[in-house]
From Swiss-Prot:
PANTHER family in UniProt: MATURASE K
Xref: InterPro entries: Domain_X (IPR024937), Maturase_MatK (IPR002866), Maturase_MatK_N (IPR024942)
Name the UniProt record assigns to this protein: Maturase K
Function, in words: Usually encoded in the trnK tRNA gene intron. Probably assists in splicing its own and other chloroplast group II introns.
Any one annotated GO CC term: chloroplast
Keywords associated with the record: Chloroplast, mRNA processing, Plastid, RNA-binding, tRNA processing
Gene Ontology biological process terms in this record: mRNA processing; RNA splicing; tRNA processing
Similarity-based family: Belongs to the intron maturase 2 family. MatK subfamily.
MF terms (GO), sorted A to Z: RNA binding
Organism: Crataegus monogyna (Hawthorn)
Pfam families to which the protein is assigned, alphabetical: Intron_maturas2, MatK_N
Amino acid sequence: MEEFQGYLELDRYQQHDFLYPLIFREYIYALAHDHGLNRSILLDNVGYDTKYSLLIIKRLISRMYQQNHLIISANDSNQNQFFGYNKNLYSQMMSEGFAVIVEIPFSLRLVSSLEATEIVKSYNLRSIHSIFPFLEDKFPHLNYVSDVLIPYPIHLEILVQTLRYWVKDPSSLHLLRFFLHEYYNWNSLITPKKIIFSKSNPRLFLLLYNSHVCEYESILLFLRNQSSHLRLTSSGIFFERIHFYEKKKYPVPVEKVFVNDFPAAILWFFKDPFMHYVRYQGKSILSSKDTPLLMNKWKYYLVNLWQCHSYVWSQPGRIYINQLSKHSLDFLGYFSSMRPNLSVVRGQMLENSFIMDNAMKKLDTLVPIIPLIGSLAKVKFCNALGHPISKSTWADSSDFDIIDRFVHICRNLSHYYSGSSRKKSLYRIKYILRLSCVKTLARKHKSTVRTFLKRLGYKLLDEFFTEEEQILSLIFPRASYTLKKFYRGRIWYLDIFCINDLVNHE
């Protein structure tokens, strides 16, 4: 946000709610490019950096001033050259710059709310696995759970209408319609992975999706407050911001919750003694300690809310209510289930001794090995059975680049899944990547795997065996007096702001 405040004349634009002229400013595209580079830290770089230059941005802006050249038919070939670059790059640059502009109203509200609550920033954040204490503390005491797939709008115009409550600039909304109608495949919106987590245009559709979900969740929260007089505890986890937030232990107004939680959050939940609601990406989880009657009530709340207010179609029969003890949750890339953890306690009173069997439920977080192998097979690291193969498209790179790419992916997956209670599946994934790296190097040097390892030695793969503790710095300073106040409550930290494509398996 310092970049926004440093470049933009915020008072003048806020006064008139007029954001459209910013599309012609060069620094907007620079901010979008910096955001894309930060996301690529956890992704396989596909040449994002090499396609962008200040000269291309200048040419793009000069062309946008000419109205006849701005409109490109969707029927044109994707390889039609625009000053030497194809139409996909042209539309990608404009959509990313436009997403930065539309985020300005939300970012300003976010900064003002942070200043009001004295929540400070930290760039040394902890692991994503600190989210799971929420499940470990509460879910073992619950009985029923339901996985809900959040439906998508029937028409893209619904997304534009939702954004009108936040962006008052008609020109910006018309430009948004232009992007939706001219540049993007309408059928792909139905599949959330292809749009929300796409490498080509993640920011714009992430913004549209969050505004759509935020709209109906604000009403859902209102219904929850009307149905219960108990105190509400709400929490927000942000993957697109490098801020951390205190768990709120007090009743929170509806407007404040969603102004704070909206800008780029893909995980949000509230809970009370009767009902727990968790949203992650395009899914939501309902869990309850009570009877199935309460679960059915909230299920019909959701369906009626989607159909009557958000104009999306959903059927109650597609939302199944399961017993938590017999059902596994697909949450944050893990398979989470409850398993009994038996412990024997021997006690003695005077001369009499006795033995007590204490059965406790424990959250079991497993690595989804089959979907991960499918993801590795899709990008040609192994076959469908999990047997490692060489990455032929990388064989032309240098040895250092090949090893660095494999180590980057291996460390990323190891970091993400190191919180698993059973690491056997994680070791298998690391084995596939190590052997695929060796086969790729052997293919490049036209040798066999055994001969290649015998010639260079096994020290070649030492990078794969580096312990995670030697790579990640998880030290958090406690010297500040302001920070000491937040340590009294539960604070959750994230350092993964973009989930790897291999984690977002189908």
